[in-house]
């Protein structure tokens, strides 16, 4: 299976880069992983609603340029479906059984995802109603994908 993660913004912190490298290495035995970083737009401190919408649209356009027609797109969104780790593992497995071999996870910037990206998505996933830094979230997503593959294969890891 091919898994692509499209994320707004570059990882800045060394510890996050190391975690992404570690999970990427672990995942290499289960899937082909591709991580795409798109430029995040600077949000002024007192941005108006209109300015925030324009920023989301710009970031959304950059995301959409990286999405191909054959990709099954999973948008990470606060209004998405919440799954347990086991359900998430089953979800990925079921997609593979149905012939979906190109999964793409999309992580928005600090303002979230544009309506165009959400419309293009095939599924909306929510990890929690809490807000997480989008850079840290990339590591959390990779960990859950790795955990999902371990569960799928009946391998020790999931507790």
UniProtKB/Swiss-Prot annotation:
Alphabetical UniProt keywords: Cytoplasm, Methyltransferase, rRNA processing, S-adenosyl-L-methionine, Transferase
Domain of life: Bacteria
Entry similarity comment: Belongs to the RNA methyltransferase RlmH family.
EC number of this enzyme: 2.1.1.177
Protein name per Swiss-Prot or TrEMBL: Ribosomal RNA large subunit methyltransferase H
SUPFAM superfamilies in the record: alpha/beta knot
Reaction(s) catalysed by this chain's protein: pseudouridine(1915) in 23S rRNA + S-adenosyl-L-methionine = N(3)-methylpseudouridine(1915) in 23S rRNA + S-adenosyl-L-homocysteine + H(+)
The protein's enzyme class: transferase
Xref: Pfam families: SPOUT_MTase
Lineage of source species: Bacteria, Bacillati, Bacillota, Clostridia, Eubacteriales
The species this protein was found in: Clostridium tetani (strain Massachusetts / E88)
Main function: Specifically methylates the pseudouridine at position 1915 (m3Psi1915) in 23S rRNA.
């Amino acid at each position: 299976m091919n898994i692509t993660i499209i994320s707004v913004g570059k990882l800045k912190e060394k510890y996050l880069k190391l975690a992404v490298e570690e999970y990427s290495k672990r995942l290499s035995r289960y899937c082909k992983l591709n991580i795409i970083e798109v430029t995040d737009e600077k949000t002024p401190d007192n941005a108006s609603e209109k300015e925030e919408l324009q920023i989301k649209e710009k970031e959304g356009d950059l995301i959409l340029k990286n999405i191909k027609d054959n990709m099954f797109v999973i948008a990470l969104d606060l209004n998405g479906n919440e799954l347990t780790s086991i359900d998430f593992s089953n979800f990925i497995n079921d997609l593979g059984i149905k012939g979906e071999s190109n999964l793409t996870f999309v992580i928005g910037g600090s303002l979230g995802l544009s309506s165009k990206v959400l419309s293009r998505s095939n599924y909306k996933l929510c990890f929690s109603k809490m807000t997480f830094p989008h850079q840290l979230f990339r590591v959390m997503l990779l960990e859950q994908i790795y955990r999902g593959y371990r569960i799928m294969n009946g391998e020790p890891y999931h507790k």
